[in-house]
Regions:
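Enzyme catalytic cores with a strong preference for nitrogen-chemistry domains
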Residues: 1-172
């Protein structure tokens, strides 16, 4: 938990092994780079910056892979978002923030994270590059497949984001 460097190293090993075995899409869990269970550590700027630095390094060091999705927290406009970063060939293709933030039973993500519904921009700057940012992004993979992304609770609602993503052309 909160050991971003260790999580990064494990992710790099996984991508190498999976790429060598022929995987064309590698997906890591929600908030993988920090771990999901950081609690109030998500309020620490050092953790958020460490995750962003790890994402930049991860994208560069996995340039040989087809497509990778990894979870991390991203701060934008004074809000913190639970996001999935889509990487391909060394580039960060886009950042998808979670839309439905659970706040019941053992889930209390609203303590730390904002919904993508609060997003009032279409991009973020990462490593001096403008990167698309939004819950409605579609990504065309090298195979030609079109990918849409939703995160955990997003799938559990009556009309999940994937419904609109599919209507707009997502295959995966």
């Amino acid at each position: 938990v909160a050991n971003v460097e260790k999580n990064l190293q494990n992710a790099l090993k996984t991508v190498k092994a999976e790429s060598e075995s022929g995987s064309s899409l590698i997906v890591f869990p929600e908030l993988y780079l920090t771990a999901y269970t950081c609690g109030d550590l998500f309020l620490q700027d050092a953790l958020i910056q460490s995750a962003l630095d790890a994402l930049i390094k991860f994208s560069k060091e996995t340039a040989y892979s087809d497509a990778v999705i990894v979870g991390l927290p991203i701060k934008k406009g004074g809000e913190l978002y639970n996001c999935a970063a889509v990487l391909q060939s060394g580039a960060i293709l886009g950042i998808v923030p979670k839309t439905y933030i659970p706040n019941y039973n053992e889930y209390y993500e609203k303590r730390w994270f904002a919904s993508s519904e609060k997003v009032n921009c279409s991009s973020v700057i990462i490593d001096d590059e403008e990167v698309p940012f939004g819950s409605n992004l579609l990504f065309t993979l090298s195979s030609g497949a079109v990918l849409g992304v939703e995160i955990c609770e997003d799938l559990w609602v009556p009309v999940p984001p994937s419904s609109e993503l599919c209507l707009n052309g997502a295959d995966i």
